[in-house]
Amino acid sequence: MRRAALRLCTLSKGLLAPSRGLTQESQNPENVFHIREVRDKLREIVGASTNWRDHVKAMEERKLLHSFLAKSQKGLPPRTMKDSYIEVFLPLGSQPELREKYLTVQNTVRFGRILEDLDSLGVLICYMHNKIHSAKMSPLSIVTALVDKIDMCKKNLSPEQDIKFSGHVSWVGKTSMEVKMHMFQLHGNDFSPVLDATFVMVARDSENKGPAFVNPLILESPEEEELFQQGELNKGRRVAFSSTSLLKMAPTAEERTTIHEMFLNTLDPKTISFRSRVLPANSVWMENSKLKSLDICHPQERNIFNRIFGGFLMRKAYELGWATACNFGGSRPFIVAVDDIMFQKPVEVGSLLFLSAQVCFTQGNYIQVRVHSEVASLQDKEHMTTNVFHFTFMSEKEVPLVFPRTYGESMLYLDGQRHFKSMSAPVTLKRNYVVEP
């Protein structure tokens, strides 16, 4: 499993390596940012207010940008991958005053903060792709639709070494874009790969009420064509995964056998009854692995469109997931992969955010954690699902098995097993790239 995660990271690295033109763009100052400049640049692009009291006025001004929206994609100039390529530096080593925000008690880097930075970076990359030179502000409202996959190459990050992010648009539909992002950390004189991330972003109109067209993408090399093809494969994989969801289809024969065998293993051998259940040795009931949290969504956590920042939601979910894995495994867990985070509904400022995390699958040293996110307004007590997060952690020691007691928990177990197995089954391309051991 660990080798599989590393393979995914080195595979993506191999894809970008032949396309040296993408990295050459870093010589352009307009494509290089300090981490503090990213959010400021986004506010400038959309004309967002810096004060909460002015947010209504700012949103009213954005309505005037509706005339700049294209009627069709054909009316938009095509862009290249180089047009959207940017680099962002997080100088933890050379600017120690930045460390406090990113520091863990174990003297490593907070991965939740990295998720926030990746979310902001992905949005900025898409605005670079759809840049309108004749307009000061963009008429598009670009938001994160899906975190397709994040794969880690390293277990630990040093808070005393500089970090670099890079990324660009790798696939474009009519109103959506796939963004490839990479993170590196300085070791000696070189930046070593830390993670690869694939996000899917969607473009909305200036009022964030309906879809908007994005600039088409021109492919300039065989490597870029392969990146685009991988985007097509990713889209197909997501459709296939969704169509076979346990919310739509019954488990496979193999999965049904797995659940039945687990059920039989929990029957009390002293009685001949389906009602008497006992927990096998070195095991935990799934219902006992839960942790929950509640947050009030204050204006401080808003995004440039005055909804709650998606990176904040990911950070809170990750931190609860990490705590759940730590509590379950009894030792410090390390994040291995993040996948299939669908942003189903925006979270309004002032909402109550309910997070519920539980271990749904384990194998060896690995813990699959599912975090369910719900919101409720202060006026309306109805809860609505906004996100479901899937995190794969690796513990320092072997962890107990987790056993479901109900049919619903059995489905969560199988869903967790599917997400875990997907880590070792990356999308394969025609060309055979050399994979580091």
Swiss-Prot record:
Task: List keywords of the entry alphabetically.
Answer: Acetylation, Hydrolase, Membrane, Mitochondrion, Mitochondrion inner membrane, Repeat, Serine esterase, Transit peptide
Q: How is its activity regulated?
A: Strongly inhibited by NADH and CoA.
In terms of superkingdom, the source organism counts as Eukaryota
* Residues with PTM N6-acetyllysine: K101
- Where is this gene product found? Mitochondrion; Mitochondrion matrix; Mitochondrion inner membrane
**Record-stated family:** Belongs to the acyl coenzyme A hydrolase family.
What's this chain's function?
Mitochondrial acyl-CoA thioesterase. Catalyzes the hydrolysis of acyl-CoAs into free fatty acids and coenzyme A (CoA), regulating their respective intracellular levels. Regulates both mitochondrial lipid and amino acid metabolism.
Name of this protein: Acyl-coenzyme A thioesterase 9, mitochondrial
Q: What is the species listed in this Swiss-Prot or TrEMBL entry?
A: Bos taurus (Bovine)
